[in-house]
Amino acid sequence: RAVACLPALIGAWRHRAGGVLLSSSGMYPVNRAALQRPDLLAGKTPRTINMSTIGNDLLRAASPEFGPQIEALVVYNSNPVAVAPESGKVVQGFARDNLFTVVLEHFKTDTADYADYILPATTQLEHWDVHLSYGHTDVMLNQPAIAPVGQAKPNTQIFRELAKRMGFDEACFKDSDETMCRDAFGDKVDFAHLLRDGFAPLNVPDAPFAQGGFPTPSGKCEFFSARLAAQGLDGLPDHVPNYESLGSSAIYPLAMISPPARNFLNSSFVNVKSLRDMEGEPLLEIHADDAAQRGIAHGTVVKVFNDRGSYHCKAHISPRARQGVVHGLGIWWRKLGLHGTNVNELTSQHLTDMGRGPVFYDCLVQVALNEVQ
């Protein structure tokens, strides 16, 4: 928040490229009401589960606070057994005998290993979709290049068929994927342009907030946010200490971050053998002094652990790691890692105050030589 305030503080928003950009995805005028149809809820508020705490929540019993125990789960576009924090608890939850799990997938992921049913999903080559971006302002159209292979179906078709079997007869459950692509932007994007060219640029100015007009109640860049203060959060962008701060624990003196490995995209592509061969094995980048204190040599198998769990990887002594900080590279699928583990054994289900997201990089650990190399 403090960094985001700097361009307004010095008046840089008036200049082309003078502002700040986290992601361009918020600039897309998606008609979410047309796609999500909140009007059909008729005043009801369905229970929502934060996917970052799925490990705890799958293990929770029924209670007035939590509601009924989770008895069924449909997983799509995700591999939570590999990517969700504190994966030891995630595995315990998915392994419950009384949990009915359906996974929509292309591959036999760690999560698919715990499915009662695996339904084959179409790939991007086989279905309609529209795409936003993190870093540019073109809407992109995805048209199927081939018919669905075998029994594969788009997620949306599975949802339509499930809705029909559950007795939902609203017209929206009969919308085709192409119709939803057309409805996604309404009259904000020329769909004929999309069909012709495959992409359509948004009509956005080079200096969007040169004259103000921020999406805030005041229309200004608000250094103090009354909306956040009303939620019990700090209205000013003050420093918030880490959940697990370096130096706060004698037992776990190292801070661990878990950035993507060079040849994977988080947990995607880990199943591609040629990419695994290039990546080698799960690596932990560690500073030479931290390694020497623990008798760790370059290339030896180490155990990284805290109170939440442990995982195994190979030590990579590197100047990229500063003293006191280690880098657990990549979200390896558990079954493709060392000893059936990955870095998310150690990450926490604690949530941030703003946004209720996971604190993946607030993670204190210890590193030791593994007993068996």
What are these regions (language model features)?
Residues 2-5, 120, 158-161, 165:
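Generic recognition of well-ordered alpha-helical segments
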Residues 2-114, 122-130, 142, 195-294:
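Extended redox/cofactor-interaction regions of prokaryotic respiratory oxidoreductases
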Residues 35-36, 117-118, 133-137, 186-188:
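Short, surface-exposed amphipathic charged segments that create phosphate/polyanion-binding patches used
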Residues 90, 96-100, 104-109, 144-164, ...:
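Phosphate/diphosphate-binding loops
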Residues 118, 221, 310-311:
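Short, solvent-exposed loop/turn motifs
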Residues 119-120, 345:
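Catalytic alpha/beta core of large soluble enzyme barrels
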Residues 125-148, 163, 349:
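Glycine/threonine-rich phosphate-binding loop and adjacent beta-strand/alpha-helix elements that clamp
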Residues 149-200, 267, 272-285, 289-373:
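Long, contiguous, secondary-structure-rich segments that constitute the structural scaffold
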